[in-house]
């Protein structure tokens, strides 16, 4: 794409947290993420990408070419269908039909053929079999031959196929859909995405030009657990049980202080495939610098971007391995400091700008 960036970039991002939980782990009761072998704190790349998306959505407010694909409460399949409609590509029609509990349980045990989903509402005692608009009927029939389900299941699926008016996009149409999604959604153009949903028109896969590592704390962290009290209860039953005391106990997890380091990479060749241009790049830098200013919450405490050092290569493929550039940025504790770090001033960030190789320019953006 002609307006795409023409240079490779690598960057170092430093951010910190004070008395907050920068990225809770849902598999560990929302405790701050930690490397169990070293005790260093972790923040996932997905967490940072979420904040970039939120910032872009806030600043651009859904402007043309700057909508966000993965946003809160989004139904992703709708975006695919909308893209195909805007391209004037005819789609099939999704089919939904009621079925029985026996069919539901049978397919749950056997597995569901590609292009078909089955859902249940146990409260309403209803079971819905859905054939996707782009389901491949031939592929489903092959599945029936290979898996040989019982007659009741086979009959239900065959009847659904008769009723369904499916149409699978051609390879050329899939590529058109992919291009439309890249053009319309900033986060797809930036980070890429898997756009081959089972329940929506296939838009292929996109490798994003911008990629991030996990962020790792400079020093080990010790998460703290705090008891908190709410001076109210949710139900009358709780109030009666507490004889009117009406208190609810809870837990809150924080990191007293941690400075995190993240590395990032921006590929010019991949930017050419998605149309990631200079305006997109500038928005990305702005997001990294300001994302925490619009993401405050009681759980996250005080977070801030402390440093963003950008290395720009004078070629698309780059002139120096990224790790050699990252080694120019070092972080050390200030001298004569034997107490745990509790502020950014407890660290000294050094950047050896004199050793930046030829063919690379460095910029300290914050």
Regions found by a protein language model. Name each.
Residues 1-46, 50-366:
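Basic polyanion-binding and macromolecular-assembly surfaces
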């Amino acid at each position: 794409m002609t307006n795409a960036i023409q240079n490779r970039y690598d960057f170092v991002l430093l951010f910190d947290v004070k008395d907050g939980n920068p990225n809770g782990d849902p598999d560990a009761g929302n405790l701050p993420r930690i490397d169990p072998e070293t005790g260093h704190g972790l923040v996932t790349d997905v967490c940072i990408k979420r904040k970039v998306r939120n910032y872009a959505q806030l600043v651009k407010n859904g402007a043309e070419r700057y909508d966000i694909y993965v946003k809160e409460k989004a139904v992703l399949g709708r975006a695919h269908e909308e893209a195909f409609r805007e391209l004037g590509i005819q789609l099939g029609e999704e089919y939904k039909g009621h079925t029985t509990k026996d069919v539901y349980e049978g397919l749950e045990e056997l597995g569901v053929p590609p292009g078909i989903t089955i859902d249940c509402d146990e409260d309403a005692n209803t079971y819905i079999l859905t054939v996707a608009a782009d389901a491949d009927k031939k592929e489903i029939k092959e599945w029936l031959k290979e898996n040989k389900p019982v007659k009741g299941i086979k009959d239900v699926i065959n009847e659904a196929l008769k009723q369904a008016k499916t149409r699978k996009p051609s390879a050329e149409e899939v590529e058109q859909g992919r291009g439309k999604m890249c053009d319309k959604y900033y986060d797809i153009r930036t980070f890429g995405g898997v756009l081959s949903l089972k329940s929506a028109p296939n838009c292929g896969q996109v490798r994003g030009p911008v990629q991030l590592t996990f962020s790792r704390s400079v020093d080990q962290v010790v998460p703290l657990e705090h008891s908190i009290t709410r001076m109210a209860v949710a139900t009358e039953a709780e109030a009666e049980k507490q004889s009117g005391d009406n208190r609810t106990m809870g837990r809150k997890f924080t990191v007293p202080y941690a400075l995190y380091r993240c590395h990032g990479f921006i590929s010019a060749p991949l930017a050419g495939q998605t149309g990631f241009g200079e305006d997109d790049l500038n928005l990305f830098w702005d997001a990294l610098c300001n994302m925490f200013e619009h993401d405050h919450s009681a759980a996250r405490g005080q977070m801030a971007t402390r440093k963003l050092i950008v290395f720009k290569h004078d070629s698309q493929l780059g002139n120096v391995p990224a790790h050699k550039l990252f080694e120019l940025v070092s972080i050390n504790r200030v001298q004569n400091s034997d107490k745990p770090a509790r502020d950014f001033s407890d660290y000294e960030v050094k950047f050896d700008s004199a050793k930046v190789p030829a063919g690379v320019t460095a910029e300290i953006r914050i």
